[in-house]
């Protein structure tokens, strides 16, 4: 089975204790190990899978439709290994590999690496001549 990138959702909800989810995501580095924890007693979703940093801080959850898929694989005896991939404006991303394989970060295209979407465009500087 091929490695997959999965969204980490719920990143703006507060944690019961410790630092906030978005703060913890901000200090995660691409390639850091990520822990996936099933939450069968979650009152909102019995298939919920919490995503935690290598420091044990909850980052959010895997989207519900992907959580059902991952949970089914676990029940069938498959294993998963996950790493932090990236953070964007609305969610975090993790990379997961299956059955003892090590996840690797996807290649970044030259366009994505060089783009500047900061919204800051300085005024041109003209010579006084």
Show the residue positions of the predicted features.
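Conserved active-site motif detector
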Residues: 1-129
């Amino acid at each position: 089975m091929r490695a997959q990138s999965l969204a980490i959702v719920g990143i703006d909800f507060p944690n019961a204790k410790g630092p906030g989810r978005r703060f913890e995501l901000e200090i995660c580095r691409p390639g850091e190990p990520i822990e996936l924890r099933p939450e069968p007693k979650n009152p909102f979703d019995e298939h919920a899978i919490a995503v935690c940093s290598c420091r044990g801080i909850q980052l959010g959850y895997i989207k519900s439709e992907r959580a059902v898929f991952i949970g089914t694989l676990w029940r069938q005896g498959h294993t998963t290994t996950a790493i932090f991939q990236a953070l964007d404006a609305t969610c975090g991303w993790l990379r997961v590999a299956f059955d003892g394989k090590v996840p690797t970060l996807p290649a970044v295209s030259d366009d994505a690496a060089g783009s500047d979407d900061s919204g800051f465009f300085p005024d041109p500087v003209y010579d006084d001549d």
